[in-house]
Structures are given as C-alpha cells and as structure tokens.
Amino acid sequence: DMYYFRLQELVRKEICRDLPSVVSISMSNLERAQKYFMMVAESAPLRPKSIDVTRKINMLRQQSDSLLRFFHDMRLIYYSADQLGTTPAKQKVFMGDTNLLISFFGDKENRQLMCETYFLSQMRSVANVEFMVNGDFLIGGKYIFAVGDPLRGYDRLRFVPDAYAAIYGLPKSVFNRMPAWILGFSY
C-alpha cells in the first residue's frame, strides 16, 4: 500500500534530518540508527536484545538507550521511562501508533499487539502510562487496565478498585469491561 510506504519514507527522512540536530552523529551511525529503528519495529512489543543489536549493527547499550529516548521524543515509539533500569529483555517498547505498527511491522493479524498499541496511543495523550509486571497498564498512577483478547479471563479484575479491561471486538461495555474503540473518545 502506498500510504504505508510513504509513511516509512517519511520516518526515515525525519530520523536523518532531526537526529543530527540533536546529537553530533556520523553518517555511518545515522545508518545504524535507522537499522536500530527497524529492529525495534520488528521486535515490538519487546525491546531488541542487546546481544542482537551488538551483533547485527555494532551498537553499545548506551547508544541504543539514547536512540530509544530520541525515538520516544519523536513519538515513533513508546516505552515507560521507569523501565530503562531493567534488563532490556523485559522492557516493553510499542510503536507510536497503529499506522506505524502496520507500516513497519506489517502484521495486521496480531490483534493483541494492535489493541495494546491503540490503547497506548489514546491514553498517553491524556495521562502517564506505566507498564505493570503482569502485562497490565497503570494509567495516571491510579487506574489499572488489562488490554486485549475477548477470550482472556478478566475475572481477576472484578473486585480490584479502579481496574478495567479494554477488549477488542467487544460490542458494548459490561461491568468493568469496555470495547477498546471507546478509548478513542478520551481526547
């Protein structure tokens, strides 16, 4: 599709144009930055392993951390800032929105990842979003959201105060479960 090709081209141009204005970077490192972005896109929702980054594009962890911050500031990706201290294998990194996810990742069939990416793109515009250890999301330090599959068990949230489930494919809200699309009205 031409739209997604154009979006990829636009992102590559932005990286080439904006990154040198923020940090002094050589042309070879600029190419590595683009390759690293592609690695991040392909490994979403997990951060690429440091050993893979070192082997494939010869980049140190400090460099990859600073590039992650840059991509986050450009809103190309989203990660929770409190995760940078943890090991990279456990860090979650999502694409900035579903258009970027489809454009670079290409997997429209991974509905769980699509739903989580959509959820993040909607909620981070109105509140701080943190990732919880169990895979849920903490919104604004108060609300807990489980995001995803309608067949997944959400009974664990039933008696937890301020806990909700954003579910794709759900036609209407029932108790603390809501359709994921309704979050589009959050801003």
Predicted region positions:
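Domain-level recognition of nuclease-like catalytic cores that cleave nucleotide substrates
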Residues: 171-187
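Conserved catalytic cores of phosphodiester-cleaving nucleases, focusing on short active-site segments
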Residues: 123, 135-153
